[in-house]
Amino acid sequence: LRPSLGLSSRAGIIPFGHTQDTGGPLARTVEDIAIVLDATVGFDPADPSPAASNGKIPRAYTAFLKRNALKSARIGVLTEFFGTAPEDREVGDVVRHALEEMKAQGATLIDVAVPNLSTQLQASNLLTQELKFYLGDYLKKSGGPVASVEELLGSGLHAAQLQGILDIANNTPDDYLAGDDYKRRLAARDALAKAVIKVMDDNRLDSLAYPVTRRIAPVLPSGNQIGSNAGLSAQTGMPAMSVPAGFTVGGVPVGVELLGRPFAEPTLIGLAYSFEQATRHRRPPIFSGRESAGPPAEPPGADAVAFDVTATGAFTVPARFRFDSRTRGLGFDIQPSASIDQIGGVYLARRVKRTNGGVAPILAKTGPTPPTGARSLADNEVAALKTGKL
């Protein structure tokens, strides 16, 4: 559940942006969501934003766990968020089937559209613009080794996947929050929220429904998630709950998102619980958790190469690597000079210009024995390895 902006305290959350940061529960069941929500909502003097929720918090969210909540519910199907590309069809089919299951439980489905939705989402996005200031302020106050986004980038010790967003944030003008563009985007956020609520009011809807993402989760490590619909809740401050909708033919889990009016978490909990109890789409992962995180063990190809590297830092860490371009697997055997218990992690870094392009962990602290293992390399990591930049 992503709660309404202002329902719960943000104190202690590493911030991305003032206009859309909110913390909510992630759980296996809707009942667990309601239990955690009861324990975490309300005013906190360390964060004045929950004052907006005064008078809007029920005595107990668990009271809305009702199996018949879908009966007579009116759900707006936000058709634009299903996408039209062939790659969108697989997820869309699963979510449409889930909506038919809601209909079978008594819900009425109404196809709806928010005027100029794509344009409004683009005009109201503030994630990268605010990141420089709010994350930077957090880093400065934390007393850690870096005190700004610029210093974080300079260290090269950020997750490689964040390179793009951190670059954009770092290039935001220092006076941006006092400028006209920021004011326009704030106004656009208000306009977007009003447009969504108008659609819900005009059609007497209890919620909107759409895929959490339009496409299936990508194959790691080189895939990037495409087609996220998370921006609507984030940029309006309205609550949204993702519920298991089923699985693709290939066994990939798919979620349906239910969006409600501000502080309508009780409604979302009821609808989600009713759907969950009727369908039981969630099932435990098919893996045990004991499998290796690296690529499967295979005989090395003819073009496999081995090389030695010694990393220096607080400790000396000599390592032997084996790279097989056939499988893109990078095997490693690390023999640190200190006890493995004293090492928090060993990382691969990709050099970009004069700084690193972020880091990817190849080793987490695993025990007292010298670690060996393997991981698959992403496309940019393979290219960096071949040019001496990994």
How does the language model describe each region?
Residues 298-346, 350-390:
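Metal-centered catalytic cores of metalloenzymes
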Residues 64-80, 129-197, 244-253:
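Short helix-loop capping/hinge segments that flank enzyme active sites or metal/cofactor-binding pockets
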Residues 206:
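Conserved acidic residues
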